[in-house]
From Swiss-Prot:
Protein name (record): Uncharacterized membrane protein Rv3486
Topology of the protein relative to the lipid bilayer: Multi-pass membrane protein
GO-annotated cellular components: plasma membrane
Cellular localization per UniProt: Cell membrane
Keyword annotations from UniProtKB, A to Z: Cell membrane, Membrane, Transmembrane, Transmembrane helix
Amino acid sequence: MAITGSAAPSWPRLLHAEGPPSVICIRLLVGLVFLSEGIQKFMYPDQLGPGRFERIGIPAATFFADLDGVVEIVCGTLVLLGLLTRVAAVPLLIDMVGAIVLTKLRALQPGGFLGVEGFWGMAHAARTDLSMLLGLIFLLWSGPGRWSLDRRLSKRATACGAR
């Protein structure tokens, strides 16, 4: 039974990849940061992987640190390649919101992160996370740009649909 109408997935729209050539700069940097962060969770488990997750109070720290590392490696690579970019951005967005909530909002409490209290301490601590969050929202909204595998897939899907 074929899916028709509004229930049918719109792959050409999901893969749509136009926009200025400069989008590649954002996509490559966002993908590279997530890929490198994911790899580092396995290279330095005490500082960035399960050890860090335990220190901030995450239950089942090894499981969640490994899951986080795999998500960052896989989705970071997809973003880097411009392949299923919008799909890959969603788990990374969830990852960043979780990182901000679990590690940065504590700075709003007295004596919080870096011993700096209040909003400015949190803003300082969260600057990289917020920048990555903004980059992911941009890619989710605009797509991966002209120089991406999504664009090639989109052209192919559009050509197949025109037949």
